[in-house]
Amino acid sequence: MPIMKKIRAAVVGYGNIGKYVIEALEAAADFEVVGVVRRASSVAAAGESKYPVVSSLEQLEGVDVAILCTPSRLVEQSAETALKLGISTVDSFDIHSGIADMRARLDVIARENNAAALISAGWDPGSDSVVRALLEVCAPQGITYTNFGPGMSMGHTVAVKAIEGVKAALSMTIPVGTGIHRRMVYIELEEGYDFDTVANAIKNDAYFVHDETHVTKVESVDALLDMGHGVNMTRKGVSGKTQNQRFEFNMSINNPALTSQILVAGARAVLRPKAGAYTMIEIPIIDFLAGEREDIIRRLV
């Protein structure tokens, strides 16, 4: 039997997602970790590490794919850097309103550099997007409601932490129903800052401005922290001319662990298509799975 050539992956960013991505890569037999890319200030303070820790992708050799674990607002810049080096990328960019435009911009860069970018490949957007598409296959006419939580939103929490005056933060997503959500934000305030001013800045951030948002000052965010999250997705629609077709999908998960697992599967899948930028619904689901295609078909079909 020929020796399988492993996919050489670089991890860009080493927060919660980056750490869980390393775990998922170590659990995947078809991957090897080339190294971790961090900010220069973090590299100096990294200490001993199982893998090389560098400040730029150029310092790593033979990278097949870069898994971008940066905050969403830094994803496009990180993707451009990697793609211009001819390195394919996968990310979990989660600002829904910006996905289509970012895909169009990265598509041009990816094609120019003979690489591929898989964007918004977390669980939502990402795997939930695939489920929503499949539900529309089953019932083309109808309504799908996606209800998140209750649970910790990684993207919203990171967005709050970036606001001036916030020392620590937790953003909880509470489902109201029919796709409507309430944001419960808990913050530790930096000394010298006015709570009302900081709370107003949070409520007017793009992550929160369209939802009912409550901001509460707390002594310790760590005392509240739970990385659990979940989703309930329902569709009621029509198959052919038959009414009242009902579908439901539920999951309760550790947020960064699932996001990271899907990112690693995406790192496998993004090496299959021709150059360009893609979302998860554009790539065959079989490409996300490890193993021989014929074996997968026999097992799942």
Describe each PLM feature range.
Residues 14-15:
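Glycine-rich Rossmann-fold phosphate-binding loop(s) that bind the pyrophosphate
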Residues 18-19, 75:
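N-terminal Rossmann-fold NAD(P) dinucleotide-binding loop
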Residues 93-117:
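Rossmann-fold NAD(P)-binding glycine/threonine-rich loop
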Residues 127-147, 155-159:
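Rossmann-like NAD(P)H-binding beta-loop-alpha module
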